[in-house]
Amino acid sequence: MKILYSLRRFYHVETLFNGTFVLAGRDQETTGFAWWAGNARLINLSGKLLGAHVAHAGLIVFWAGAMNLFEVAHFVPEKPMYEQGLILLPHLATLGWGVGPGGEVLDTFPYFVSGVLHLISSAVLGFGGIYHALLGPETLEESFPFFGYVWKDRNKMTTILGIHLILLGLGAFLLVLKALYFGGVYDTWAPGGGDVRKITNLTLSPGVIFGYLLKSPFGGEGWIVSVDDLEDIIGGHVWLGSICVLGGIWHILTKPFAWARRAFVWSGEAYLSYSLGALSVFGFIACCFVWFNNTAYPSEFYGPTGPEASQAQAFTFLVRDQRLGANVGSAQGPTGLGKYLMRSPTGEVIFGGETMRFWDLRAPWLEPLRGPNGLDLSRLKKDIQPWQERRSAEYMTHAPLGSLNSVGGVATEINAVNYVSPRSWLATSHFVLGFFFFVGHLWHAGRARAAAAGFEKGIDRDLEPVLYMTPLN
């Protein structure tokens, strides 16, 4: 049988397949990996691996552009975005493009421009990917040493890490620039029901910004997911951008310390596992953010959060029954607690009934009615504005509870709208992807550690039936 290792560098993995099958000159015999192992065949071919990565970026950007134009083509301005299954236009609207007071869409042209720009970019990336995969040099080390690398070269790896960190930091600063100088961003808390505004008074206090990281993740605290004003969000991006850029410069200029050299596994598969672990964490955090946070993800575009829809229902019926003459301050419910209002364990006045579990919801349509001790009875009697009633009735009937076949709304709510909320889509997809990436992290971390220890030999396949079958080709 033919040898299964590259003469350039032995790789401790056996993947037996059809040894004579050749794919573009990168066959199992020279790499130790069969065709179905994908980019593993390119571990030591930096030029071809560059092509694979650039082409992958092209696919991502192509999806963004094509899906963006698809959403623009299907968009109906008379309906809220969240009723139309949109997930990209809400992000553009949140950045302040094309919308005005109350989140009303005034102009879809910026969305069209965004889609076209992404499509053009994807063509450039696609061409670069195909060029490097098929025509460019197989390895970059000889012709372009700056872009070349050896996986176990710790200094080069941290330099590459530094470059990536600087790019991430610049990305964070792009949001800061948009919020400060280029038209501002959409603020759901703007008086009268939300508007686009420039963020002028940034929160730069480290106590406030890093205080979020020290909060408990549970109800009433909510860790970083509890952020509820744009000054903190944009200020946080100033901090994050600065840390990423400075950390990137640090990693470019320094070599890893001895403890870091000992602590980490320095191989391509190890770096893959670290990256998958990081993406997994991002996915889980994004899941919580889009599900619970109505400042970074305004309800005008993404629909109400679960707690928000529930509190909106309590508010809507409080308004109705108060008009019909009920004394909402003293009416008793079936459990003996307040029917419309009650006290939380810490003494705040909150909505009564089953929605009591969501007493710590904060939403722009509700906060004006709070006083120093929770909901203010006199404000509930005198100060409720028509826009607050309209918005809560709308949110009540758009709870983010849709199942796979779009049975939206609460089971007992005959007025609920039959739809699946973008919050449901985005939270579920990011949780599932975060989980899969975590499993991938464990898998590749285990293989990388085993290979580093020298005992990863693959599965013993002496008795595998496929070895005795006729080759596919």
UniProtKB/Swiss-Prot annotation:
Keywords: Acetylation, Chlorophyll, Chloroplast, Chromophore, Manganese, Membrane, Metal-binding, Phosphoprotein, Photosynthesis, Photosystem II, Plastid, Thylakoid, Transmembrane, Transmembrane helix. The modification Phosphothreonine is found at T15. It is found in: Plastid, Chloroplast thylakoid membrane. It comes from the Eukaryota. GO terms for cellular component: chloroplast thylakoid membrane; photosystem II. GO terms for biological process: photosynthetic electron transport in photosystem II. Belongs to the PsbB/PsbC family. PsbC subfamily. This is Photosystem II CP43 reaction center protein. The gene is psbC.
